[in-house]
């Protein structure tokens, strides 16, 4: 056993026969006769070039490696049991696996199997153990083998490190640095770092033992022999055996393999060879032929053959070992230069030297190496074994070059070396002759004989360009070395050294003959070396001058390069800014996108309409879906449009969303059916189909357009997109919406969207969003201005401070220096004197403590300020982030309500769309031009390429959103350079989808950056890249699908449930006489046909008590009598009117019944049933009643309703209490006539009974007629266009009839009679009656004033009343208060109403008249404010006629004075006053 030199074993000197050793090396006991040999060997052993064979530690001295091997040997004796040796060595011998794999395999074999000869315990019982020894291992059965293979595959390995790799890395590192003479201390530190005790296992291994569990034993069966007795027990399972000795860990196994085997060669597949002694000891089987495995070993063991064959490569094995080692070492070895043309080969067996019986001694071998190489090279030669070029040709091919090598050496020597000379002196002669062989500079230029030998022996190295014959060996070596190692990082420093050496040796001619790749490298290195020489010979002044010139030249070059680069960039920029017609440019073809997937039955051409509807719902979701319902998506809508049964719920929900906004707008005020507004009819999923048909009738559109044509503004533009073909509406009369075709459904949806776009709600919504956006921008600009002002102030302040510091700096510095000097001078002697005194020491300590305390306080204060500043900065940062977020959201919402435009167009005029998340993906629209679009451009005019959106948008079916937005893209590009020469072609409208990031990147790559259209498209796509990627990912999400539902069955079921619900509520609320609920329910459930349902609805209407009906179903039997009752002519007119109205009611009811009988769809029946529901006074229902006295619900059997005021009373809450419900009509004490109340109290006043009765009759009749008037007032709006206010009807219905009654004619005579002086004395009854009448009149007044306030509220909401809502300011009109002396506006009137300033209706009307008079006086004829005044006054008159019919409105209109007269005499004219908005000034 001996340490390794490189990767080869270095043989020890054999003991001298029969002589006493003169010089002995202590640790190896090698003996030498001469001091020279001894010292040479000691010097070699002291160098750090040795490697421990057992541990792989490198950079050691021979003694350190030797001691480490001895330590490993002792460790193996202790830790590695002998019975594992054969098991492991059989696996290792001739194995080609790596060391780590061998260690893992051997360790796993040891851990999962008992070895033959292993001593262990055999468990017989629970506590009985027998000492046994393993004799035989039975092989596994097939099933067990398969199971163990799986287990062994998954077995875990303990962590370990590869010593070979570590040694190689360390040697590589040492090879990169040229080793010079180093300190002994440095050598010791390197030694300590490199040395590694084998007994100290790594911590990673110890930790690993805790982390993982050892593998389980394989289910082998064993034959065991008892140690105490000579008995063998067969087939013992592994579970019954217990290991007594700890098996070796992986580190120990690694030491064992390295200690007893060596790898034959340096290749990855080189076999491991176990020492011969152990092979013989354990009879290890050979897996290769001995000669094939190691021809050198074979020759060494057969010396007679070697002597005969002088041309064999192993004539001199010690020399072969040396040459192999040198081939793995640094390329600077001159011995390699002469043989660079030869083929490299693998070294033989590492054990060959040890066992060889060659005549050449190791001293001769070392002496040769010492004389050939410098000491610096020796370091790299021996301790850096690397897989160089020789490792590339293993196996048999290594024979030939070695033979050639030996042959060439023999020829060059001119003699044969015997190889078995034992004398060291003879050995020392051979290196001298070989030194001549090694220096072949003369040979390369000399005889032909010398140059032929290397060429014959293997040829030149393979290079890309064959070098010239006469290239020096240094150049040849560089070419070969560069080719083999140019791409290797670990060889970079070595390659640099070779290049430097070659650059020094070669002449300029030789450098010129090098290959191109190497020529530049060598030339640059040569110039660098020459520069270093010149630099070394320069003086300091010359160097400074040289550097100065160099800098100037460099600056000049840099300036020139920068100038050239700027010019080049400017030219490139100008070239890139040029734009050309896309179709005239040549570039990559655009990628082919796939068509948008649409369900069966929905053609691809309709996708644009689907996207338009969904995008409209998404953009206006704040208006249409304020309660944040589930959004409508394009995929679901397409499925609903094409589905047979699944689309009912989804489509009707879309219709409900759209109609909710449309019917509540002023634009739908005139939409009605059978005298009832559509907004009054309940809007549900089941009635929406019929309501859509009623909304889209042409009659409604024509009435609306005719009515709005009279307006002065442009609100009433005629749109064709909001109309639907009559065929579709006729189909809706006989079929439901979900039963139409996909195209018909889509056309109806788009028409509804366009109709909603015309509403005032949408206009208000857009204005609100834009106003919010403008306010956000104002805030942003204000914040930016404030920040800029702060920065400017800080900058100014800093400049002033710097100027002050510059002025005072010099003086202060001068004074400060002198003061400091004085202080130092004064202070020093004080310190010296005070240091000697104890008192001064105490004082100084106190002063230091006080100073430290102050410093702590200062630090705490500074820390507190710092924390506060940080908190303030964090608060400001959060505030800014929130403001930025609100700003971005507001701007995005403002953009949403504007016209949606495409991202851009490509060379073929295809449009690219990116919609909201509900329509995910990047869409490409082809064939979007149709007949209604006038697409043209003008070569001479750069301002217009399209005739304008207004020219074609009204005629386009998809002009408002989504599908066909304006062509702003082309317009924007044409304003810069008018280079477009092509127009889009008409064709089939198709939609394509880009649904992957790869396709998007490919599209961006194909778009031409200089195309007039594609350049803009590319820029916008790149800008919105992340948004597009997000949309593409959303498009990949699976659709949840629609809920399947049979539409007809759904309509039928809900019609039944609605009928049952109405009947039940009528019965429970006491509003009608309905048969038994169970019988009615059974009858309704049995109905199937529409005709039967119609009869049931008609019967249900007939069962409602007449006085609980309202609207067109309310009876009109009594009308209000005029105040002039004596006129017979007026009575006749009144009778005629009464008859006409009764006929109208009867005809409206008959029309309703006829419509029910003729209904052909369930949705139509739902609408007609909804009309009946709206005509029932549900607020009169007993279900909602509370006792007026105790304000409690419950005890319905004891609750009674007043037939006049409909208020509820408990029987026991009345005074006097009632004990049972009275028959017939009943009135509460407040509604009872005065006579009845007096009679009930037992008082008799016969003198006034007749007059009171007549008064009561008249008042009762009058109150009934007035009540009937109020019931129908919400259904008769005299030409007004206000939004419906359903809540007002509920307020009016709870007003007591006594308060609603008009002025009673019998009150005035009473008051006059009471005022006469000769009247009889007033008794208590008359006082009571007087008080009662006063209360009634005050109640009536307060009710009328309440109605005035409601009228004013409606007037303020009226859209034409905007000029009169607030007072006019001086900013709006400077001369307003010079003309108008009594200004008045609705806000002032509202304030007076809320403060109770008005005592009568006439005072209220006076102020209202003043508002309109002011407007007439101030504004000129034709003013927009005057038109608003006329409409607002008409609205007021209609509301007064409806709510306060007893108060006529008459205002005398003033003639307009000339302007001068009005200005001069405006203050003196009492009636020439008015009010208007200052924004409409006089012309």
From Swiss-Prot:
Residues 604-668 form the DDT domain. Pfam families: Bromodomain, PHD, WAC_Acf1_DNA_bd, WHIM1, WSD. Residues 1339-1443 form the Bromo domain. Residues 533-586, 768-814, 850-893, 1245-1283 form a coiled coil. Its EC number is 2.7.10.2. Belongs to the WAL family. BAZ1B subfamily. The modification N6-acetyllysine is found at residue 1335. The modification Phosphothreonine is found at residue 266. This is Tyrosine-protein kinase BAZ1B. One of its GO terms (cellular component) is B-WICH complex. Ubiquitously expressed with high levels of expression in heart, brain, placenta, skeletal muscle and ovary.
